[in-house]
Amino acid sequence: MKIRRCRITALMLSAALLLGGCGSTAASGGNSGNDSAGTDVTKDKTKDAADKTKKAPEIEGLTYESTMDLTYATEFDVYYYKDGYKLIDVHEDKQYLIVPEGEEEPENLADDIVVIQQPTENIYMAATASMSLFDAFGGIDKVKFSGLEASGWYVECAKEAMESGAMTFAGKYSEPDYETRVDGDCGLAIESTMILHTPKVQEMIEDLGIPVFVDYSSYESHPLGRTEWIKLYGALLNKEEEADTFFDQQAHVIEELKGFENTEKTVAYFYVSTDGSIVVRKSDDYIPSMIEIAGGRYAFKDLKNPDSNAPSVKLTMEEFYATAVDADYLIYNGTIDGQVNSISELEAKNELFSEFKAVKDGNVWYTGKNLYQATDTVGELIKDMHLMLTDGDESQMTFLEKME
């Protein structure tokens, strides 16, 4: 602890120099209140579909036993080894070796494998979409530090923990409170991919001896793939059984929704960026999958991100107009730059919206800022979309509201 504390001053000086322009320039962080994939920095894919069937990594001194059973998630694997060791492989990023309490790190471990020593506790949570998963399997008491103030949480247990003092604000992802984390013996920082905008900050956290885990759940193409990350976090805390039980319940909810007959009505899901561009989801993202399950068709049928594997794509207004002007429904993603509550507010962002079919027909909806944190209840948004597509009872909706 003394060694870690002594390094804080030097690290904070480095941070000050970087912020003052004396270091390398980081990419823009976007809206710090959300860890949306819309502004994620990404790596090019280097793995193909065969990765899902690859053999478990061989680790000197460890004996492989089994692999976690996954149904929808494709962005990670968890391998189990004898004596309680586990290896988490996040395909877009790194591998993380979970070392059980009382055991030691294997000798000659590859330098690029991040070691997480159990018990996993005093966690810093900046990946806001993951907090609801911790709450769902009973692991929220292991989260001691938050990347949001109490007012920023829509997960009730997290908000209550902040207000009671059980959980403490320790700086947002880009401006960490290093001293608070060190004094509180932070054992793990769980970050969204927004941390990739500030690589120097991640390095400084790691230099303090705090392992950093980056959550890529937003890269999943199926809505339940994102929820299935609860199994990964269950493995971190040795709560696999509780995580499996919750996931099976959510999977059952989604399976029941698959009987919806498709209406063939088209839906565009988007938000307007601060630079005036339109940000939409690529076609194989989990949001278009939800629209399909709900009984609709995503307006952008074959949209890909040409530059990276990020789930969102920036379009010019002209590009968006060409496809979405005739869409039956527009859904404005209010989790990013705040809710747009009325048609007039939408048209103020760009007057061309007045020409859209959905605007003329009064079929424009928006999501609340709480949606991104609700990773544990994806079925509710699908139900909302189905009610929207079938002119159902709006009072039964959880996340969608109609623009007036």
Short names for language-model regions:
Residues 1-9:
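Bacterial N-terminal signal peptides that target proteins for export
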Residues 2, 23-131, 242-269, 393-404:
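Bacterial Sec-exported substrate-binding components of ABC uptake systems
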Residues 17-21:
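C-terminal motif of bacterial Sec signal peptides marking the signal peptidase cleavage site
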Residues 51, 220-248, 326-404:
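Structured C-terminal subdomain patch of bacterial secreted/periplasmic proteins
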Residues 86-91, 96-182, 188-194:
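A short, structured surface patch at a secondary-structure boundary
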Residues 121, 128-139, 146-157, 197-200, ...:
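Extracytoplasmic ligand-binding site segments that recognize negatively charged/polar headgroups
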Residues 122-125, 142-147, 188-192, 212-215, ...:
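Structural recognition of the beta-strand scaffold that forms the well-ordered cores
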Residues 259-341:
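Flexible, glycine-rich surface segments
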